[in-house]
Each structure stands twice: as structure tokens, then as C-alpha cells.
Amino acid sequence: MKKILLMAIVSVLISTSNSYGDSKPVFMSPDWAKAAVDAWNNDTVLTVELFKSGWATNTKNGRGFKIIEIYREDCPKSQHIQLKIEPKDGKAVCVYGGEVSDKEPDYIMWAKTDRWIAMGKGEYGPMKAMTFRRLKFDGPMWEAMKNMGPFSAFLLLTGKVDSDFSSCH
């Protein structure tokens, strides 16, 4: 009897640790943003093209970095998240992903979850998304328009991070 009880406890502990270890970050949570850092830095369109175009070095008041803030419109109580991009070694490198840390973002983008999912799958890009107000945008529009390829890659990045879409945080 003791042996059966011990085996049951061990199997519960193993299954519990596996379920927590395999969990996906909630979409656009601070944990998701941390995973997005790697996705950004592994995308040559984002890292190389945004540096080549001058986007990464065109920073507010010469502060040396860009901040992109994003959130889910249909999750009003969830935190906004930020990605911090710096020019390093000829690339636009994402050095931070997580909770809002800078009160003056360069860009703020928001959309409903189903729209983020569609953009992450490449069902449509930034032009269609903004034209039909599927993606709301605050920031230097002209700068974004000059970087449509990387802007499209950024929207696709939202689909590259394995995510839990079932809750808001």
C-alpha cells in the first residue's frame, strides 16, 4: 500500500513539473516579450535592414535606443510590454523585452488578439492592417513607411513566439 501511494505521489509530481515546464507564455505578457527578444535577434530583416536604413540610429534626443510598446486592445487590464532596440555592431539588436520601463516609447502599437494572430501568420501586412484600422499605431509614420519590409517582419515576429492566447495575463 505504501509503495502504491509513493508511486502515485511521484507520478503527480512528475506530471505537475512537466506541465509547468512546457507552458507557453501568455501572448504579449512580459514573459512573451522576453522570448520575443530572441525572435527579433534571429531575424535578419529586423536586425540588418533596420540598421542599414538608419532606423536604429535615429533615436529621440540622441538617447541611443528605440522603444516599441505593444499591447492587446481586447485585454484592457493587461500590461503593455516594450522591446528596446539598440544599434550594436552594425545591427539593430533587441536588448530588452518585458514590462514597460520607458515612459517615452518611439512607437505604440495595439490591436485585438485575433488581429495580432492574423498578422503574425502573414494573412496581411502593415499597410492593410493600418488602412483598415486592424492595427492602431502611434509614432513617426513616415519613418515606419520607409521601413515597410522590417515593419512586416515585426508583425510576423508576433507569430513566431509560441504563445498562449487563451487568457489576457
Question: Where are the model-predicted features located?
Answer:
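Bacterial N-terminal signal peptides
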Residues: 7-15
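Feature captures hydrophobic
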Residues: 20-169
